Amino acid sequence: MGRNKKKKKRDGDDRRPRLVLNFDEEKRREYLTGFHKRKVERKKAAIEEIKQRLKQEQKKLREERHQEYLKMLAEREEALEEADELERLVTAKTESVQYDHPNHTVTVTTISDLDLSGARLLGLPLPEQGDQDGSQEEEMSSLEKPTKALPRKSKDPLLSQRISSLTATLHAHSRKKVKRKHPRRAQDSTKKPPSATRTSKTQRRRRMTGKARHNGE
Protein backbone atom coordinates (compact mmCIF):
# COMPACT_ATOMS: atom_id res chain seq x y z
CA MET A 1 0.00 0.00 0.00
CA GLY A 2 1.32 3.31 -0.89
CA ARG A 3 1.69 6.01 1.63
CA ASN A 4 -0.69 8.82 1.35
CA LYS A 5 1.30 11.93 0.74
CA LYS A 6 -0.08 14.86 2.49
CA LYS A 7 -0.05 17.96 0.45
CA LYS A 8 1.45 20.91 2.22
CA LYS A 9 -0.52 24.03 2.01
CA ARG A 10 1.45 27.07 1.04
CA ASP A 11 -0.50 30.15 1.60
CA GLY A 12 0.90 33.54 0.77
CA ASP A 13 0.02 34.83 4.23
CA ASP A 14 2.21 32.26 6.03
CA ARG A 15 5.39 33.07 4.13
CA ARG A 16 7.99 35.29 5.75
CA PRO A 17 9.36 38.22 3.76
CA ARG A 18 12.84 37.65 2.43
CA LEU A 19 15.67 39.76 3.79
CA VAL A 20 18.11 41.01 1.22
CA LEU A 21 21.46 42.32 2.48
CA ASN A 22 23.24 44.72 0.21
CA PHE A 23 26.79 45.65 1.15
CA ASP A 24 28.08 49.06 0.20
CA GLU A 25 31.74 48.61 -0.62
CA GLU A 26 32.58 52.29 -0.25
CA LYS A 27 31.09 52.54 3.24
CA ARG A 28 32.74 49.26 4.24
CA ARG A 29 36.12 50.48 3.02
CA GLU A 30 35.64 53.80 4.78
CA TYR A 31 34.81 52.06 8.05
CA LEU A 32 37.78 49.71 7.85
CA THR A 33 40.28 52.40 6.84
CA GLY A 34 38.81 55.19 8.99
CA PHE A 35 40.46 54.32 12.31
CA HIS A 36 43.51 56.48 11.65
CA LYS A 37 41.33 59.29 10.33
CA ARG A 38 39.16 59.29 13.45
CA LYS A 39 42.27 59.21 15.64
CA VAL A 40 43.68 62.28 13.86
CA GLU A 41 40.35 64.08 14.25
CA ARG A 42 40.34 63.38 17.99
CA LYS A 43 43.86 64.79 18.28
CA LYS A 44 42.84 67.92 16.39
CA ALA A 45 39.84 68.41 18.68
CA ALA A 46 42.06 68.03 21.76
CA ILE A 47 44.54 70.60 20.42
CA GLU A 48 41.75 73.07 19.70
CA GLU A 49 40.40 72.63 23.23
CA ILE A 50 43.88 73.29 24.67
CA LYS A 51 44.18 76.46 22.57
CA GLN A 52 40.81 77.72 23.79
CA ARG A 53 41.75 77.09 27.42
CA LEU A 54 45.07 78.88 26.87
CA LYS A 55 43.27 81.92 25.46
CA GLN A 56 40.91 82.02 28.45
CA GLU A 57 43.79 81.83 30.95
CA GLN A 58 45.67 84.62 29.14
CA LYS A 59 42.53 86.77 29.14
CA LYS A 60 42.11 86.29 32.91
CA LEU A 61 45.75 87.21 33.48
CA ARG A 62 45.42 90.39 31.40
CA GLU A 63 42.30 91.43 33.33
CA GLU A 64 44.06 90.91 36.68
CA ARG A 65 47.05 92.97 35.54
CA HIS A 66 44.74 95.74 34.36
CA GLN A 67 43.00 95.83 37.76
CA GLU A 68 46.37 95.98 39.52
CA TYR A 69 47.46 98.84 37.27
CA LEU A 70 44.28 100.82 38.04
CA LYS A 71 44.76 100.26 41.77
CA MET A 72 48.39 101.40 41.62
CA LEU A 73 47.37 104.48 39.60
CA ALA A 74 44.75 105.43 42.19
CA GLU A 75 47.34 105.09 44.97
CA ARG A 76 49.77 107.31 43.05
CA GLU A 77 47.12 109.99 42.48
CA GLU A 78 46.24 109.97 46.17
CA ALA A 79 49.91 110.36 47.13
CA LEU A 80 50.32 113.27 44.68
CA GLU A 81 47.25 114.98 46.12
CA GLU A 82 48.70 114.67 49.63
CA ALA A 83 52.02 116.13 48.43
CA ASP A 84 50.22 119.06 46.78
CA GLU A 85 48.28 119.70 49.99
CA LEU A 86 51.52 119.70 51.98
CA GLU A 87 53.15 122.14 49.57
CA ARG A 88 50.11 124.41 49.70
CA LEU A 89 50.20 124.52 53.50
CA VAL A 90 53.92 125.28 53.52
CA THR A 91 53.61 128.13 51.01
CA ALA A 92 50.58 129.55 52.84
CA LYS A 93 52.56 129.89 56.07
CA THR A 94 55.58 131.54 54.39
CA GLU A 95 56.16 135.30 54.63
CA SER A 96 58.97 137.16 52.92
CA VAL A 97 60.09 140.78 53.42
CA GLN A 98 62.66 142.56 51.27
CA TYR A 99 64.86 145.40 52.42
CA ASP A 100 66.52 147.52 49.76
CA HIS A 101 69.91 149.02 50.54
CA PRO A 102 72.10 151.15 48.26
CA ASN A 103 74.72 148.39 47.88
CA HIS A 104 72.68 145.15 48.24
CA THR A 105 69.22 143.70 48.80
CA VAL A 106 68.26 141.70 51.90
CA THR A 107 65.32 139.26 51.90
CA VAL A 108 63.99 137.90 55.20
CA THR A 109 61.71 134.83 55.00
CA THR A 110 59.66 133.69 57.99
CA ILE A 111 58.17 130.16 58.07
CA SER A 112 55.81 129.34 60.90
CA ASP A 113 55.70 125.90 62.53
CA LEU A 114 53.22 123.43 61.01
CA ASP A 115 51.40 120.61 62.77
CA LEU A 116 51.68 117.92 60.10
CA SER A 117 50.30 115.20 62.36
CA GLY A 118 47.06 117.16 62.78
CA ALA A 119 46.54 117.32 59.01
CA ARG A 120 47.20 113.54 58.84
CA LEU A 121 49.98 114.08 56.37
CA LEU A 122 52.62 112.42 58.50
CA GLY A 123 51.50 109.87 61.06
CA LEU A 124 54.91 109.50 62.73
CA PRO A 125 55.31 110.13 66.48
CA LEU A 126 56.72 113.48 67.54
CA PRO A 127 60.51 113.37 68.04
CA GLU A 128 62.40 114.91 70.91
CA GLN A 129 63.35 118.59 70.89
CA GLY A 130 67.02 117.88 70.26
CA ASP A 131 66.35 115.81 67.10
CA GLN A 132 63.61 117.97 65.54
CA ASP A 133 65.87 119.67 63.00
CA GLY A 134 67.39 116.42 61.73
CA SER A 135 64.03 114.65 61.48
CA GLN A 136 62.49 117.54 59.51
CA GLU A 137 65.34 117.45 56.99
CA GLU A 138 64.96 113.68 56.57
CA GLU A 139 61.21 114.03 56.03
CA MET A 140 61.66 116.72 53.37
CA SER A 141 64.35 114.67 51.59
CA SER A 142 62.09 111.60 51.59
CA LEU A 143 59.28 113.62 50.03
CA GLU A 144 61.57 114.98 47.32
CA LYS A 145 62.80 111.53 46.26
CA PRO A 146 60.93 110.14 43.23
CA THR A 147 58.94 107.00 43.85
CA LYS A 148 59.91 103.93 41.87
CA ALA A 149 57.37 101.84 40.04
CA LEU A 150 56.54 98.61 41.78
CA PRO A 151 57.07 95.36 39.86
CA ARG A 152 53.97 93.79 38.49
CA LYS A 153 52.98 90.57 40.17
CA SER A 154 50.06 88.41 39.28
CA LYS A 155 47.60 87.78 42.09
CA ASP A 156 47.03 84.17 41.15
CA PRO A 157 50.30 82.29 40.42
CA LEU A 158 48.28 79.25 39.34
CA LEU A 159 47.27 81.07 36.15
CA SER A 160 50.87 81.38 34.98
CA GLN A 161 51.49 77.72 35.83
CA ARG A 162 48.44 76.66 33.81
CA ILE A 163 49.53 78.79 30.86
CA SER A 164 53.04 77.28 30.92
CA SER A 165 51.65 73.72 31.11
CA LEU A 166 49.26 74.32 28.21
CA THR A 167 52.01 75.82 26.04
CA ALA A 168 54.25 72.85 26.86
CA THR A 169 51.59 70.40 25.66
CA LEU A 170 51.14 72.36 22.43
CA HIS A 171 54.92 72.31 21.81
CA ALA A 172 54.99 68.56 22.47
CA HIS A 173 52.26 67.95 19.85
CA SER A 174 54.10 70.09 17.29
CA ARG A 175 57.38 68.22 17.92
CA LYS A 176 55.68 64.86 17.37
CA LYS A 177 54.35 66.06 14.01
CA VAL A 178 57.81 67.19 12.88
CA LYS A 179 59.39 63.88 13.85
CA ARG A 180 56.79 61.84 11.95
CA LYS A 181 57.18 63.78 8.71
CA HIS A 182 60.67 62.45 7.77
CA PRO A 183 61.05 58.90 9.10
CA ARG A 184 62.45 57.45 5.87
CA ARG A 185 65.38 59.82 5.61
CA ALA A 186 66.69 58.71 8.96
CA GLN A 187 66.47 55.06 7.89
CA ASP A 188 68.25 55.78 4.61
CA SER A 189 71.07 57.54 6.42
CA THR A 190 71.67 54.46 8.63
CA LYS A 191 72.09 52.17 5.61
CA LYS A 192 75.68 51.20 4.88
CA PRO A 193 77.06 51.79 1.38
CA PRO A 194 77.78 48.66 -0.66
CA SER A 195 81.33 47.42 -0.28
CA ALA A 196 83.66 48.00 -3.21
CA THR A 197 85.31 44.53 -2.85
CA ARG A 198 82.09 42.64 -3.54
CA THR A 199 82.15 40.52 -6.73
CA SER A 200 79.24 39.40 -8.86
CA LYS A 201 78.40 35.83 -9.93
CA THR A 202 79.70 36.31 -13.46
CA GLN A 203 83.08 37.52 -12.19
CA ARG A 204 83.38 34.49 -9.92
CA ARG A 205 82.51 32.12 -12.78
CA ARG A 206 85.15 33.67 -15.01
CA ARG A 207 87.75 33.27 -12.31
CA MET A 208 86.82 29.61 -11.77
CA THR A 209 86.94 28.81 -15.50
CA GLY A 210 90.31 30.52 -15.82
CA LYS A 211 91.73 28.44 -12.98
CA ALA A 212 90.38 25.20 -14.49
CA ARG A 213 91.99 25.90 -17.87
CA HIS A 214 95.31 26.70 -16.26
CA ASN A 215 95.26 23.42 -14.31
CA GLY A 216 94.36 21.42 -17.45
CA GLU A 217 97.36 22.79 -19.34
Curated annotation (Swiss-Prot):
Biased composition (Basic residues): 172-184, 201-217
Main subcellular localisation: nucleus
Cytoplasm as UniProt keyword: yes
Subcellular location(s) of the protein: Nucleus, Nucleolus; Nucleus; Cytoplasm
Keyword Nucleus: yes
Record InterPro entries: Nucleolar_protein_12
One function term, GO molecular function aspect: rRNA binding
Gene Ontology cellular-component terms listed: cytoplasm; nucleolus
Region (Disordered): 122-217
Tissue and organ expression note: Expressed in brain, lung, spleen, kidney and heart.
Annotated Acidic residues bias: 130-141
Keywords: Coiled coil, Cytoplasm, Nucleus, RNA-binding, rRNA-binding
Coiled coil: 34-98
Family, as annotated: Belongs to the RRP17 family.
Function, as annotated: Multifunctional RNA binding protein that plays a role in RNA metabolism and DNA maintenance. Participates in the resolution of DNA stress and the maintenance of genome integrity by localizing to sites of DNA insults. Also plays a role in proper nucleolar organization by limiting nucleolar size and regulating nucleolar number. Mechanistically, regulates the nucleolar levels of fibrillarin and nucleolin, two key players in pre-rRNA processing and ribosome assembly.
PANTHER family assigned to the protein according to its UniProt record, in alphabetical order: NUCLEOLAR PROTEIN 12
Subunit structure: Interacts with KIAA1191.
Protein name: Nucleolar protein 12
Species for this entry: Mus musculus (Mouse)
